[in-house]
Design a protein with these regions (language model features):
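Mid-to-C-terminal alpha-helical segments outside catalytic/metal-binding sites
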Residues: 1-5, 10, 62, 74, ...
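Conserved, mostly hydrophobic/aromatic
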Residues: 67, 76, 109, 160, ...
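Active-site gating/metal-coordination segments in enzymes
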Residues: 15-139
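Catalytic pocket-lining loop regions of alpha/beta-barrel enzymes
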Residues: 90-238, 246, 263-280, 315, ...
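N-terminal cationic-hydrophobic initiation segments that often serve targeting/anchoring roles
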Residues: 3, 38-42, 68, 148-149, ...
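Alpha-helical elements of Rossmann-like donor-binding domains used by nucleotide-donor carbohydrate transfer enzymes
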Residues: 33, 63-66, 104, 143-146, ...
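Short catalytic-loop micro-motif centered on adjacent basic/acidic residues
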Residues: 48-52, 157, 239
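Conserved strand-to-helix beginnings and helix N-cap segments that scaffold or border functional pockets
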Residues: 24-28, 61, 217, 221, ...
Length: 336
């Protein structure tokens, strides 16, 4: 799905925590084992790995120490909402700027040289104030500015760029953007560098882009334009959240074709995104993440184009295989 059915060359394997640990997707050891297996098969550095950190859970800091010593993740992954599926009954939500709880972790991350902190934000239902009472605030970015300013040696990568809407049509959010020029929580993220004078805040697009790339490309243009204008083109990162949605190729194709309409550029002072292989899209697709993860793109590309996975893909194509633009997910059915 990732390396054969799409144009993806390097990927990052992640996980997620839940109040009920039996729901956990992959343990930190399993993520690391996946990285080892793929890179052994390929003979190159194809797969990077997160370690998930879980503040407020028993033994969480000991797990951080263990990961630093043995797992050696490429970056960290955290969920300020605690459990991303439903309001945490265990109270595992937390803030990025909690000096007592989180700052000791930041100190360890800086000392270990694992200084990229990826944080899940946004993606709540339309009735979030009612369905996530007392918890929804932790999905916003109102805790990010101070943390980023206090820890300039850390890179804060906000997953989904804190876009609020989840599993709903982007039409209503686009209407709000057309009226106010703002996109719920994503605009807040884009304004942080100017408000706090920081350059270590990044927006990853993930599921946020997946939910609108095909269903409402105008909103996708407004979303990406907002991020590029506020964060700068050098701090917007590609992400697909695949294989949740199958091969990421359909999202790759959508981004290649995406452009901000001229009237939107003029009204909101958005830059043009340009060609698929132009400066801005190349930075989003690969260059920005490569810098964060210390990947020399020229060296890496040389190794990847001649590795075992490249050979497997060549065999696949020779046998008639093609890139997949299929999107996995639910289909809404409406009664007549």
């Amino acid at each position: 799905e990732v390396f054969v059915d799409s144009d993806t060359k390097v990927a990052l394997l992640s996980g997620a925590p839940f109040d009920d640990s039996s729901w956990d997707l992959l343990s930190n050891d399993q993520i690391a084992a996946g990285r080892t297996a793929i890179n052994r098969i390929s003979g190159s550095r194809r797969l990077l790995a997160h370690s998930v950190f879980t503040p407020k859970k028993d033994g969480w800091m000991e797990e951080v120490d263990r990961c630093i010593a043995k797992v050696k993740p490429d970056s960290w992954k955290g969920y300020t909402v605690g459990d991303p599926l439903s309001p945490s009954k265990l109270g595992t939500y937390w803030r990025l700027d909690d000096e007592k709880l989180i700052y000791p972790f930041y100190e360890k991350a800086v000392k270990a040289g694992i200084n990229t902190i990826c944080i899940h934000k946004g993606l709540l239902p339309a009735d979030y104030e009612k369905s996530w009472p007392g918890v929804w605030e932790y999905a916003t970015v109102n805790d990010l500015g101070k943390a980023a300013k206090d820890w300039p040696k850390l890179n804060f990568v906000i997953y989904h760029s804190a876009l609020r809407p989840f599993q709903e049509s982007p039409d209503a959010v686009l209407a709000e953007f057309d009226k106010t020029g703002r996109i719920q929580w994503a605009t807040d993220l884009a304004e942080i560098p100017a408000k706090f004078g920081v350059k270590n805040v990044y927006g990853e697009i993930g599921t946020a882009f997946a939910t609108c790339a095909v269903t409402n490309p105008r909103f996708a243009a407004a979303f990406i334009g907002t991020l590029v204008r506020g964060l700068g083109p050098e701090r917007v990162l590609w992400g697909s959240d695949s294989v949740w949605y199958g091969s990421p190729q359909w999202q790759i194709e959508a981004m290649r074709r995406l452009e901000v309409p001229e009237e939107m550029r003029k009204q909101h002072k958005f830059p043009a995104l340009g060609a698929a292989d132009g400066k801005i899209k190349t930075a989003i697709f690969s260059g920005n993440a490569a810098k964060l993860y210390n990947v020399n793109t020229k060296t890496a590309l040389g190794a990847i184009t001649t590795d075992r996975i490249a050979a497997i893909r060549a065999e696949y194509v020779a046998a008639g295989g093609e890139r997949s633009n299929a999107r996995y997910g639910f289909v809404a059915r409406h009664s007549a």
